[in-house]
Amino acid sequence: MQTKNKQGVLLVNLGTPDEPTAPAVKRFLSQFLHDHRVVDMTRWLWCPILHGVILPIRSPKVAKLYESVWMEEGSPLMVYSKRQAKKLAQHLDMPVELGMTYGNPSLQSGFEALIAQGVEEVIVLPLYPQYSGTTTAAVSDGITKAFKQLPVMPAFSFIRDYHDHPMYIEALAHSVRQYWEEHGKGDYLLCSYHGIPKRYADNGDIYPQHCEATTRLLGEALGLSSDQIGMAYQSRFGREEWLQPYTDKTLETITSKGVKKIDIMTPAFSSDCLETLEEIAGENKEIFMEAGGEQFHYIPCLNDDDMHIDMMAELVRSKL
């Protein structure tokens, strides 16, 4: 049944393996780590390392990590992404489809699903609040590739970022206040963002400035002083220097500054996933507690919270 409304939304996130198995993880990581936006090493140097060392060794290990956070309905990121798309479609009364930069459903399949519903103009909403070439620009690259496979290219608009949007900041602040009401307030609120190599920022990627702005605005919304809130970067790999301070190193040392009860959130992640549920709520909790911490509280991502959906709807309306 074709829609009378010729506009639709493509909700985009990074993606996830189809299942928590070594072969599925290997397929996903191969696609992800082949992207020059993610790893910009010369291909003749990088590909032998990727296929000869990283994928054979990392895939089984990462599969076990995925298995530890896998939900009955599937991967956490996919479960929450589907819920977001369903709620946003109901909120806007227009077609909304998912498209992942890597894995399934692909960006191409997302466009095809919208076109099949009669959509002629697509609003693309990458769920990356803070812009980075490694994420947002990779979506743009993927769209270009997808259009090559479509018989007719739809008109489209692209929401680049929303790191300082008032509704995004308030949704974050509300989630913190709500968590504090239920669990109590810690000594310090740490905002952990996915890291990128420092070299990328040195070459002009504006990601760290966006992360800093989000943290500052969130602190203002919560009425926190600079010694009550801070930020760090997680998920680094390889030997190259990444953006600092590092989340794990911060958690190792912050107890010596009198912080025994910490609250940690991940504002750059729109949905809970391996990096939030296993790396932060699992691994990094252990680091903090072993360093002398007494209480570690992970504040979940916005996921399919109503205020998060309201914000998405407002972003889409700005393009209608």
UniProtKB/Swiss-Prot annotation:
Principal subcellular localization: cytoplasm
Return the broad EC class.
lyase
Q: Which Gene3D superfamilies match?
A: 3.40.50.1400
Question: Where is it located?
Answer: Cytoplasm
Q: Which SUPFAM superfamilies match?
A: Chelatase
Keyword entries, A-Z: Cytoplasm, Heme biosynthesis, Iron, Lyase, Metal-binding, Porphyrin biosynthesis
**Per the UniProt record, which EC number(s) apply here?**
4.98.1.1
General function of this protein:
Catalyzes the ferrous insertion into protoporphyrin IX.
Q: What is this protein called?
A: Ferrochelatase
Q: Please tell me the species this chain comes from.
A: Vibrio parahaemolyticus serotype O3:K6 (strain RIMD 2210633)
